[in-house]
Amino acid sequence: MDEIFVELKKLGAFAAFAWSHAPADNYGVIAIDGQNALRAGDKTAEKVPEGTIDWFTRSPASTVPGEVESLLDRLGASWYLNSVQYESDTGLLHYEWVWQYG
């Protein structure tokens, strides 16, 4: 699972996280939200971490969404694009992916 964090940091925008009252033009957030478990024979056979990747940008031409999806495919993660929204309070486009990897 750490591989997702390492690879996202290589994209650049995920390299540093800082709190600010004025949002940056482009930034990403990755979170682990929980896990899914496969049960077999009344026991947990496998556990897979699940999380979200959020990308915020002012540019509708941002290449990062495609890079995130290519990265998740390359790592063999299960994922889907959950939503793309315009955040009217910040003026940012917000992409959200849900992923499972393990």
Can you name each region flagged by the protein language model?
Residues 12-13, 71-79:
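A common structural junction motif
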Residues 1-39, 60, 64:
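Small/polar-rich, solvent-exposed N-terminal microdomains that initiate assembly or binding
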